[in-house]
Amino acid sequence: MEVNPPKQEHLLALKVMRLTKPTLFTNIPVTCEEKDLPGDLFNQLMKDDPSTVNGAEILMLGEMLTLPQNFGNIFLGETFSSYISVHNDSNQVVKDILVKADLQTSSQRLNLSASNAAVAELKPDCCIDDVIHHEVKEIGTHILVCAVSYTTQGGEKMYFRKFFKFQVLKPLDVKTKFYNAESDLSSVTDEVFLEAQIQNITTSPMFMEKVSLEPSIMYNVTELNSVNQAGECVSTFGSRGYLQPMDTRQYLYCLKPKKEFAEKAGIIKGVTVIGKLDIVWKTNLGERGRLQTSQLQRMAPGYGDVRLSLEAIPDTVNLEEPFHITCKITNCSSERTMDLVLEMCNTTSIHWCGISGRQLGKLHPSSSLCLALTLLSSVQGLQSVSGLRLTDTFLKRTYEYDDIAQVCVVSAAVEVEA
């Protein structure tokens, strides 16, 4: 009959502790009025409590610091620091001690040890200490693997390891939107506005130290998150840069193609890389975190070979009364002459006046034509001008143009300002 051998005791002990900043001590003040039964008892106890602030005993926040009571949360972008100690609990001298610390993520295994050289010997009651640091760049499960190998006085080689599993959480929720700029009504420019919505999804406030956009080589960027007041730039978020838990901020940036790229329309068309956001924040007692998004990609406006833009349109029109708009149609092709047909499709609120399906004639490469159109609205309120279709008779390709612009439709009894 086989008997399992007893588990061998190791001569060395391994301790691993996470290093984090302390927190301010908080207490729950219990007070009452002097006319109540306890009298001044509670107030006197709070004054005698060393953790309270002298003269402001009823404040929950004290002057003392407390060490972390648990492992806590680790968020993406923060620096994970850990203290590793190997102590010789025996009465023997241990030789050739090698301590190795690896961090296993879902995609890679990283060596965090400061030195891979073995320590010649470790006397009784002595220890080997090491501090490791790692900027966390992945979310999900992480495993810290600490391995220790050594040689006993009898020449026996020993080895053991311990595993410490922890989760890395997401601190911020970042959403981006792109808007194509318009130069009054004449044409759509190559300028792009980026709106970045950043939400704090942790349970503690953050100090937003920096939120910047690092543009790609094709663009120059202008931050639109401050205003000029009396010659001084003031943040649109006020003097306090704190982002409370579950609060959201919106940052705005304007990107404009550099001259050498703006002149080459083919480069800007299609999917273009805009750049990446660089976010730096601080939390408890100045602990810093940093996130960089992946390269933000934006689909350039799908003009195809034909671009339609507005030259003129009224802001306000009367209900059920015709009004006029002027459209500009541009052949974006540099080689091919187009023969276009214009169709006007009514919507539930917008009705086009005129002949649909008319020939516009030949449009040469890189040339434009202006077209006056008449329409009316049967519904009050802010209405979207939609329903224009241009068909290239040679390729049998139709270009659809909806949400071209918006007009405010009011009752005829309301005077329309010029």
Curated annotation (Swiss-Prot):
Superkingdom of the organism of origin: Eukaryota
Name any one Pfam family assigned in the record.
Answer: TRAPPC13_C
Q: Which InterPro entries match?
A: TRAPPC13, TRAPPC13_C, TRAPPC13_M, TRAPPC13_N
- What are the GO cellular component annotations? TRAPPIII protein complex
Q: Tell me how this protein assembles.
A: Part of the multisubunit TRAPP (transport protein particle) complex.
Give the family per the record: Belongs to the TRAPPC13 family.
Cited PANTHER family: TRAFFICKING PROTEIN PARTICLE COMPLEX SUBUNIT 13
Q: What is this protein called?
A: Trafficking protein particle complex subunit 13
| UniProt source species | Rattus norvegicus (Rat)
Q: Name the lineage.
A: Eukaryota, Metazoa, Chordata, Craniata, Vertebrata
Gene name of the record: Trappc13
